[in-house]
UniProtKB/Swiss-Prot annotation:
Pathway: Isoprenoid biosynthesis; isopentenyl diphosphate biosynthesis via mevalonate pathway
Lineage: Archaea, Thermoproteota, Thermoprotei, Desulfurococcales, Desulfurococcaceae
Key words of the record: Isoprene biosynthesis, Lyase
pH dependence of this protein's activity: Optimum pH is 7.0.
InterPro entries: PMDh-S-like (IPR012016), PMDh-S-like_dom (IPR002840), PMDh_S (IPR020794)
Protein name, as recorded: Phosphomevalonate dehydratase small subunit
Length: 132
């Protein structure tokens, strides 16, 4: 697989690289265990680049994101089509890199376990399955 490159908008800057976990829609409050970092669908967020197409839910979601970081089970970064204020506030509080503006194609092509590299300038590279 050739490296796929996408441009995104940095909201909370930082760099990250790791395996992707892909989620179409997520409410951090009620669908993510802040102690384990596992979603109600059984997907772990800890140590992964979370590609979450869209989010929804309560303002408590910001505190769940912060709790994930405090408990050592936060994602390395969060990539979204369009970040909402709840996720932005949570990532600012927790210092988790957050990028949005990724096109629908990104969420259609990236798969769980694909290695993703996020650069501070907003460049997102999908390196493919099992790439070091």
């Amino acid at each position: 697989m050739e490296v796929l490159r996408y441009r995104s908008r940095p909201i909370v800057g930082g760099e990250a690289e790791g395996p992707a976990v892909v989620i179409d829609s997520l409410s951090f409050y009620g669908e993510v265990d802040p102690e384990t970092g596992v979603t109600s669908g059984g997907k772990p967020l800890a140590g992964r680049v979370a590609a979450i197409r869209r989010s929804r839910g309560s303002t408590v979601g910001s505190y769940v994101i912060y709790a994930l970081k405090e408990n050592g089970v936060a994602p390395l970064a969060i990539l979204m089509e369009r970040a909402e204020p709840i996720v932005i506030a949570g990532c600012v509080l927790a210092g988790i890199p957050l990028y949005d503006g990724l096109p629908p194609e990104f969420f259609e092509r990236v798969r769980d376990g694909y290695r993703v590299r996020v650069h501070s300038d907003g460049l997102v590279e999908v390196l493919g399955p099992g790439q070091p």
